[in-house]
Each structure stands twice: as C-alpha cells, then as structure tokens.
Amino acid sequence: MHRSKFLVIVDDTDELKTAVQFAAQRASNTKGGLVLLSVIEYADTQQWKSVEDIIHQEARAEAEKKLQEWSEIAFNISGQTPEIVIKEGVVSEEIINYINEDKKIRFLVLAASGEDNPGPLVSLLAGQRSGKLPIPTVVIPGGLTSEEIDDLASRAQ
C-alpha cells in the first residue's frame, strides 16, 4: 500500500511543536505516514581528527535524543510511530536530497514563528530554496492554539 508521508524537520526552533502537531494529526487523519528528519551540520575541524570524532558522536547522540522525544510526542497525537532519519551535511541540501530519495513524501510541513521573522526553515525552504523542492511546502501560521491546529489538520481532508 502506498502511504503518503508528511516530513517535519527536527531542529531547535520554537515552531517545531506546531509543525509536529499539525503533521502528526494530518498523517493520522489521512492514514498517511510521518517522517521526522534531523540534519547534523558540522563545523570544519579536520585538523583535530580526534576532536572532530567526539563532536560528531555528541551531535549524533543529541539528534537521536531529540528525535526520540519528538517521536513520542507525535505518537501521542497520531497513534503511530513516525520514521526517524538522521542526515549529515548542509541542512537545505540534505532536506532536498532526502525528499528526492523518498518518493512517498508528499508534503514538507514547517511552522512560522508568529513574529516578524517567519523562522529559519521557513525563510530558507519556503523562500530562497522553494524552487528546488519537488513537493509542496505547508507553512502553519505561528500563534495558533493547539485546538486551532487540530481543527486546521482535520479540515484539510
């Protein structure tokens, strides 16, 4: 069976909660899947190989921890366990590459911050790099209540 998937990028922004809530609810309502993607971006520390290895291990452990936490939140919303994926590299490039790899991903779900600045991912992926994305980007407005997000996710059947 071909299940469409919703992709959410796990990062350190406040908007992440809104994106996860909407995407998990939409996935549940449409019997689709949910993918949580974390991209680890490293600084160049090649002259210090042992330090670089430690930094990579710590960054990966932190990404795994965050993904597990958000996976549990998504499960509590949708009743299904999301796929979790970790990539390493430039954030925008890795997101686009992953979308191109997984042909079942139908929507990239982002959330705006609700302030004057829409947030780093929205600025990058719904703005500068939007023409490079092979799927629609859904931007959830910032400042919505949890009930409004659930209503929005339910209406978009």
Predicted regions located by residue number:
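A short acidic, amphipathic alpha-helical/loop segment
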Residues: A19-F22, N97-Y98, L124-L125
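Gly/Ser-rich helix-loop-strand patches that form or flank binding pockets
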Residues: N100-Q157
